[in-house]
Curated annotation (Swiss-Prot):
The lineage of its organism: Eukaryota, Viridiplantae, Streptophyta, Embryophyta, Tracheophyta. The modification N-acetylthreonine is found at residue 2. One of its GO terms (molecular function) is electron transporter, transferring electrons within the cyclic electron transport pathway of photosynthesis activity. GO terms for biological process: photosynthetic electron transport in photosystem II. This is Photosystem II D2 protein. It comes from Cuscuta reflexa. The chain crosses the membrane at residues 41-61, 125-141, 153-166, 208-228, 279-295. NCBIfam families: psbD (TIGR01152). Its EC number is 1.10.3.9. The keyword Metal-binding applies. GO terms for cellular component: chloroplast thylakoid membrane; photosystem II.
Length: 353
């Protein structure tokens, strides 16, 4: 008996092979399997945002004007969150709230869930696109891993935080001034700037900006002169075989400046990846904590002493008073459905007043 060993070859391509060939074909803009998720979701998210900021009011959800049609500009227009009474409803157009009525769906805030969900899956599709392309050209997947950081922040802020609160109402609306209002809300109600996870996020973002500036300047400073051009761009040869800049010179320079310097390019670039990604992930974890109403640092001894001694005040106690002011003034206008009325005598006043 004869046994033949070898790979089983298919005589003809099946549907999957045909789709794979078409999706992963070499073209100007790569599509790929990830594109089946990315492109439709990005299209609907951006389309929903442009539609909402152009035409849709927030009168029925926030008591606000939020569209170009009502007189807003690019900084003040927004796609606003649904009303608090709708809690965590996904607000499908065909759901029990809108019942297929597109106008009513827009009035209830359906565009916000539409933009948020399609935006989230669009970002995930973009990360998968980086995985797919990296695998195709045999690269490591660190670009996709790095992009997980802004995705983590987006998911924590726009989904996990409002899921921990009473509804989508407390998520940020999609607009510039709307995001600023949300930041003030986070400070007043959660003392976010004194949260250690926020501190790590700030250190990550600002540290990454510093590293980026230092690295770019150092490379420009230590470029090899491989041409006779008047500037570094004309002198650059895209097919050069040697390295572009002198790591040895850069190392000697920073060793003299700081006393320490990176001596290994791999460690240097990993550090530039690690700092911002870790910072953003820590910030995302902090927002998850806020969803559960975990508190930031409380320096109670300073608050007690400030309450007892009119002459004692720290920057911390001043900030606590500012937070109380934000809560008292903001809650009434930010949550009109609660009909909150604060008498003048209960509004916070600092020691200086």
């Amino acid at each position: 008996m004869t046994i033949a060993l070898g790979k089983l070859t298919k005589d003809e391509k099946d549907l999957f092979d045909t789709m794979d060939d078409w999706l992963r074909r070499d073209r100007f803009i790569f599509v790929g399997w990830s594109g089946l998720l990315l492109f439709p979701c990005a299209y609907f998210a951006l389309g929903g945002w442009f539609t909402g900021t152009t035409f849709v009011t927030s009168w029925y959800t926030h008591g606000l004007a939020s569209s170009y049609l009502e007189g807003c500009n690019f900084l003040t227009a927004a796609v606003s969150t649904p009303a608090n009474s709708l809690a965590h409803s996904l607000l499908f157009l065909w759901g029990p709230e809108a019942q297929g009525d597109f106008t009513r769906w827009c009035q209830l805030g359906g565009l916000w869930t539409f933009v948020a969900l399609h935006g989230a899956f669009g970002l995930i599709g973009f990360m998968l696109r980086q995985f797919e392309l990296a695998r195709s050209v045999q690269l490591r997947p660190y670009n996709a891993i790095a992009f997980s950081a802004p995705i983590a922040v987006f998911i924590s802020v726009f989904f996990i935080y409002p899921l921990g609160q009473s509804g989508w109402f407390f998520a940020p609306s999609f607009g510039v001034a709307a995001i600023f209002r949300f930041i003030l809300f986070f400070q007043g109600f959660h003392n976010w700037t004194l949260n250690p996870f926020h501190m790590m996020g700030v250190a990550g973002v600002l540290g990454a900006a510093l590293l980026c500036a230092i690295h770019g300047a150092t490379v420009e400073n230590t470029l090899f002169e491989d041409g006779d051009g008047a500037n570094t761009f004309r002198a650059f040869n895209p097919t050069q075989s040697e390295e572009t800049y002198s790591m040895v010179t850069a190392n000697r320079f920073w060793s003299q400046i700081f006393g320490v310097a990176f001596s290994n390019k791999r460690w240097l670039h990993f550090f530039m990846l690690f700092v911002p990604v870790t910072g953003l992930w820590m910030s995302a974890l902090g927002v998850v904590g806020l969803a559960l109403n975990l508190r930031a640092y409380d320096f109670v001894s300073q608050e007690i002493r400030a309450a007892e001694d009119p002459e004692f005040e720290t920057f911390y106690t001043k900030n606590i008073l500012l937070n109380e002011g934000i809560r008292a003034w903001m809650a009434a206008q930010d949550q009109p459905h609660e009909n909150l009325i604060f008498p003048e005598e209960v509004l916070p006043r600092g020691n200086a007043l």
